[in-house]
Regions:
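Short alpha-helical "patches" and their helix-cap loops
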Residues: 1, 32-43, 91-98
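Short, well-structured N-terminal submotif of metal-dependent ribonuclease cores
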Residues: 1-14, 26-35, 100
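Conserved beta-strand segments of alpha/beta enzyme cores
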Residues: 8, 50, 103-105
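Acidic, PIN/NYN-like endoribonuclease modules and their adjacent C-terminal/linker elements
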Residues: 12, 76-110
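Active-site-proximal, substrate-binding regions of enzyme catalytic domains
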Residues: 20-48, 54-59
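Active-site neighborhoods of divalent-metal-dependent phosphate/nucleic-acid chemistry enzymes
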Residues: 46-92
């Protein structure tokens, strides 16, 4: 799928903490300076992301049923709740999505 102007990307509330953690790891491993990490977060905040409120019980059930961690289940649950495609390059997550009838972009499980 191609990003289209004005498209809103739905994310679970954990998304921003995962982004911040990935940037922290990059700084800690001296891959990027802290100023770049802060700038990168600022750039992402300018995108049209919408947090989708999730039910923790639904996430746990999805995690147990699909044998994925609760963090990954949150992304699956957003797609299930909204009928949206799941954008991931994680093969295992894409396969779990396919089992739930979720369209996955850009990775399509074989």
């Amino acid at each position: 799928a191609v990003h289209q102007p004005g498209m809103t990307l739905l994310v679970p509330p954990i998304f921003w903490y995962e982004v911040a953690n990935a940037l922290w790891v990059a700084v800690r491993r001296q891959r990027i300076p802290s100023g770049i990490a802060e700038e990168a977060l600022g750039v992402l905040l300018d995108f049209l992301f919408e947090e989708w409120d999730l039910d923790a019980t639904d996430c746990l059930r999805t995690a147990l049923r699909q044998d994925v961690c609760a963090y990954d289940a949150a992304y699956l649950q957003v797609a299930v709740d909204t009928g949206s495609a799941l954008w991931t390059t994680d093969r295992r997550l894409a396969m779990a999505g396919e089992q739930l009838g979720i369209e996955t972009e850009p990775h399509k499980p074989a």
